[in-house]
């Protein structure tokens, strides 16, 4: 894995959102594609997994309409030292109920918890990070090259479950079909043989598809990646993380 000289994303603040916000009245997850019609696709071995059509176009459209009503905050123009440059609008809330709904009321839980995938995720997956983040990228906005950190979290329950995040979950709600141009997520493979004469590996590009769920490994083994500039329309994303027992 590449030495981490580029900026990081959210660090420990990702696990500690301010608790004062009122919990949104999230819309129901309807309509959904039947679980039997969905599958995990490991598009880059050990690093990137996608679930095409995880959400329907109608559900994505309903959520974009709802999320537009939330009090989004524009990120600072100058990031903290060591953080990557990011220009977007965001909403962040600690909402264990929504995280559990997204985990268990969709196909995500059944797809992710298949026994043979435990090694892939870095442990026994027990749910999603209750730290829910909503991102909107308008024309000219982007997220520069960075790595996503792993965080320790506590999932509510009796007793609570001590967990850590191992994979980022990004759920795309818009795409070129909805008028969003640009905004692709780009991953940069790293060749450990610095003196090798082999050409630098080509970047791995994940195009926007409304309803696509993208999972990518983070923490110590995170690939350098970025969100390209949006050149037209709006890019909407719901962000959480897979949590494994610690």
Could you describe each region identified by the protein language model?
Residues 1-213, 221-246:
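Fe(II)/2-oxoglutarate oxygenase catalytic core
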